[in-house]
């Protein structure tokens, strides 16, 4: 285990969340040119520009998103950093807050080549605001 390498990669993932939440193009500098991106309902994208292709799916509906930086859990393992956490935001006028509403919990798997991200797989329910009522088979009166 190389703790300095792990610390550097965790720092890069923290920077990813900060830049992504701000919608800053500099987020692309954290990725390899041929990076692989996966997001539910988007599928796979290849090349770092595919990150913005994925984000375009939220054009006109995502008012803001903020990851809860102080509650992120980082798990370094070899070339990977797994991050579990919550986010909050507003989509089409409706808010969500991970841990308080059905949407907003996520797990991201970052793969690194050197100090740059070569792969990002995002695992979450993209129904952030809980509008997919027919599939709430266990009811909405749950602890989130």
Residues covered by each model-derived region:
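A solvent-exposed, acidic/Ser-Thr-rich amphipathic alpha-helical stretch
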Residues: 7, 25-77
């Amino acid at each position: 285990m190389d703790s300095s390498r792990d610390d550097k990669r965790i720092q890069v993932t923290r920077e990813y969340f900060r830049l992504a939440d701000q919608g800053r193009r500099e987020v692309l500098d954290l990725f390899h040119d041929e990076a692989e991106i996966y997001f539910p309902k988007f599928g796979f994208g290849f090349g770092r520009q595919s990150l913005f292709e994925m984000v375009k799916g939220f054009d006109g509906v995502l008012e803001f998103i903020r990851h809860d930086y102080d509650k992120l859990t980082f798990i370094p393992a070899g070339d990977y950093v797994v991050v579990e956490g919550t986010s909050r935001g507003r989509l089409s006028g409706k808010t969500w807050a991970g841990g308080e509403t059905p949407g907003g919990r996520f797990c991201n798997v970052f793969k690194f080549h050197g100090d740059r991200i070569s792969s990002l797989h995002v695992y979450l329910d993209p129904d952030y605001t809980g509008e997919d009522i027919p599939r709430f088979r266990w009811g909405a009166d749950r602890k989130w």
